[in-house]
């Protein structure tokens, strides 16, 4: 999809008349007709453009390896996923870890623990630790995006596994990245956060380990997850930066770190779509726009 004047004119026209993304949707449909699917091109597309809602879950499944590139195998692999889900669920029921009234997200957690050999003994069951809470937050958010419980489990499982595998070493460095980019955008706000002692106490776990699950409404969250699933954890930094910039007036009026932490952990749900849009623009500004060709 090389840049050319005719395409740029059409894109500008479509956006002006309210059909932003028409060409991008057509390009994605072409990519989805490939057999086998080109995972790298799908990933680059997802980095560069918003995914249409009608294709989002399918693209996520391919990028996360839930479905293979060969479309001919999708029905068979889907059945394997269903069978495995039912087998693990049945095993947990027999072991009396779950029952009819167990919340679905807790079932996902126990299934995840069983697969990863971290399932505690029934006699040693404890309240969820921080890692469990991160899992449950992501699972609750995914439940709002995906209706089917089998799809939901596999998406949560593979999302978390990929996130840890790809970005585990990068996560501890994201707060420093936030400080750097905030210094580029608003030195005054950064100085206030430092002077108040709030910079070290921002809700980093909510932002960078739960990937904003429980912070942003799902309509905004899924646009952030498009970028994470397709290979960027840096987008999380720019969403955090834009949240701080968007609520600057409120934050500048607070001097207690606890008050700032509480406000950001329970931030207003209005205008989150605009925040995410600005964050993506900021991300492209500093990190560039991946090139993509159909």
From Swiss-Prot:
Q: What InterPro entries does the record tag this protein with?
A: Rab-GAP-TBC_dom, Rab-GAP_TBC_sf, TBC1D7, TBC1D7_dom2
List the SUPFAM superfamilies. Ypt/Rab-GAP domain of gyp1p
- Enumerate the UniProt keywords alphabetically: Cytoplasm, Cytoplasmic vesicle, GTPase activation, Lysosome, Membrane
Cytoplasm listed as a keyword? yes
- An example of a Pfam family matching this protein is RabGAP-TBC
- Listed GO MF terms: GTPase activator activity; TSC1-TSC2 complex binding
Localization per Swiss-Prot or TrEMBL: Lysosome membrane; Cytoplasmic vesicle; Cytoplasm, Cytosol
- Keyword Membrane included in the entry's annotation: yes
Q: Which GO terms describe its biological process?
A: activation of GTPase activity; cellular response to starvation; negative regulation of TOR signaling; negative regulation of TORC1 signaling; response to growth factor
- Give the GO cellular component terms, alphabetically: cytoplasmic vesicle; cytosol; lysosomal membrane; TSC1-TSC2 complex
Domain Rab-GAP TBC residue range list? 50-232
Q: What does this protein do?
A: Non-catalytic component of the TSC-TBC complex, a multiprotein complex that acts as a negative regulator of the canonical mTORC1 complex, an evolutionarily conserved central nutrient sensor that stimulates anabolic reactions and macromolecule biosynthesis to promote cellular biomass generation and growth. The TSC-TBC complex acts as a GTPase-activating protein (GAP) for the small GTPase RHEB, a direct activator of the protein kinase activity of mTORC1.
The UniProt subunit note reads as follows: Component of the TSC-TBC complex (also named Rhebulator complex), composed of 2 molecules of TSC1, 2 molecules of TSC2 and 1 molecule of TBC1D7.
PANTHER family per UniProt: TBC1 DOMAIN FAMILY MEMBER 7 (PTHR13530:SF3)
Question: What protein is this chain from?
Answer: TBC1 domain family member 7
Q: Which gene encodes it?
A: tbc1d7
């Amino acid at each position: 999809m090389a840049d050319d004047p005719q395409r740029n004119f059409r894109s500008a026209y479509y956006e002006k008349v309210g059909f932003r993304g028409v060409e991008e949707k057509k390009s994605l449909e072409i990519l989805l007709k490939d057999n086998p699917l080109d995972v790298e091109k799908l990933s680059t597309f997802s980095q560069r453009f918003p995914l249409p809602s009608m294709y989002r879950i399918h693209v996520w499944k391919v990028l996360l390896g839930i479905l293979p590139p060969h479309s001919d195998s999708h029905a068979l692999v889907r059945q394997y996923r269903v069978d495995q889900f039912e087998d693990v669920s049945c095993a947990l029921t027999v072991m009396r870890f779950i029952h009819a009234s167990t919340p679905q997200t807790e079932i996902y957690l126990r299934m995840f623990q069983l697969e990863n050999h971290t399932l505690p003994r029934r006699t040693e069951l404890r309240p969820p630790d921080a890692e469990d809470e991160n899992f449950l937050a992501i699972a609750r958010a995914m439940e709002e995006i995906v209706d089917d419980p089998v799809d939901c489990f596999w998406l949560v499982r593979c999302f978390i596994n990929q996130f840890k595998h790809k970005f585990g070493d990068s996560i501890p460095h994201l707060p420093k990245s936030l400080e750097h980019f905030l210094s580029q955008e608003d030195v005054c706000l950064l100085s206030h956060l430092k002077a108040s002692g709030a910079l070290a106490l921002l809700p980093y776990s909510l932002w960078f380990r739960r990937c904003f699950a429980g912070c942003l409404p799902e309509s905004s969250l899924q646009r952030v997850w498009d970028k994470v699933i397709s290979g960027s954890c840096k987008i999380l930094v720019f969403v955090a930066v834009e949240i701080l910039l968007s609520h600057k007036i409120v934050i500048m009026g607070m001097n207690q770190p606890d008050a700032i932490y509480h406000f950001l952990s329970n931030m207003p749900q209005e205008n989150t779509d605009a925040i995410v849009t600005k964050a993506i623009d900021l991300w492209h500004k500093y990190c560039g726009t991946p090139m993509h060709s159909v």
